[in-house]
C-alpha cells in the first residue's frame, strides 16, 4: 500500500517521501512478461528502421549524384534564359522582398524574409530530484521539490506542481509569439517557391537601440520590450518581448547588408521550384551562404552520411534495448539471489550487445545487398565476429 509524507523548511523547497509494498515474485514476473511483448515489437521495429535507412541512404546518394551531373550554374540572376526552362539550376545572390514585414504593436517594420516575435513570461518553475531506497521491506522514493522564478517562452502549468500554493502562474499570456513570413521573395529576378522560403531559418536578434517604446508602460532594456512595473525586479506574470529576423533583404539598412543565399532548384520561367529526379526524390536546396554547385552537393552528401549513421546507431540501440526487455525474465527468476543475479545481469548485457551488434550489421548488409554486393559481403563477415567471440568465451575448456 502506498503512502506519502512531506517535510521542508521553506515555501520554495520541500521533500516528499512515497512508499509502497515491495513487489512479490509473481508480480515482478508479470511485469517482465509485459516487457517481453514491448521488447518484441521494438525488436521488429529496429529491423524495419535499419533496413529502410539503408535504402534511403542509397536513394539519396543516387539523387545527389544525378543532380550534380545535370546542374547548370547561372552567372546572371537578373535575366532568366528560356533555354534553361525545366533544367536543374544553381545560383547565388542577395535576397529581395517586395514588401516589409511589420508588427504595428511595437513599431517594427523591416525588409526581411521572416520576422519573429518572441514573448517570455516571468513564471514559477518546479524542479525535482528523486532517489529510491528500501526501508523495513518497503520501497520508498524521496523527492525533493524546489521552485524558482524564471523567464519562460511558454506557459508553465502550475496546476501540475506538487505544491501550487504560493507558486501559481497565469494560465495564458496577454501577448502571443508569432512568425510573419514574406509572401514574395526573390533572388535577382527569380521568385522562390514556398519550400525554398521555408529553408531560411537562421534567426538573428534585432537590436532595439534605434526603436522607441510604443507605450508609456513598456520599457526598452537589453533589446527587450518589458511589460513590467519594474523590469529589474519583475513579478510573476510580467512579460518581455524580443524580435528576431531571418533573411535580411532589400537595400543596405542599419541591420547590415542583405543576406546571400545559394539555391539549387528547377527553373520554370522566372520561378525556382522543386526538381523531380529519376530516382523519385525531390531536389530543392538552399544554403544561407555563397557556395559553388560542387560545394552544395558535398554538403548534402555529408548531411546524408551523418543522418545515415545516426539512424544506424538508433536502430542498434533500439535492438539492444528490445533484447534486454525480452531477456529480463531470466534476471527476474534469480533476482532474489544476490551473487547470482549480478552475474546473470552482466551475462545478459554482454549477450544483448553481441546479438544487437551482429543483427544490426546483418540488417545493414541486407539493405545494401542489391546496391553494393561487395560491401554487403564484408559486413556479413564482420557480423559473425561478435558471435564467434561470445561463443569462444563460453566454450568449455578441454582437459
Model segments located where?
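OB-fold and OB-like single-stranded nucleic-acid-recognition modules
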Residues: 2-397
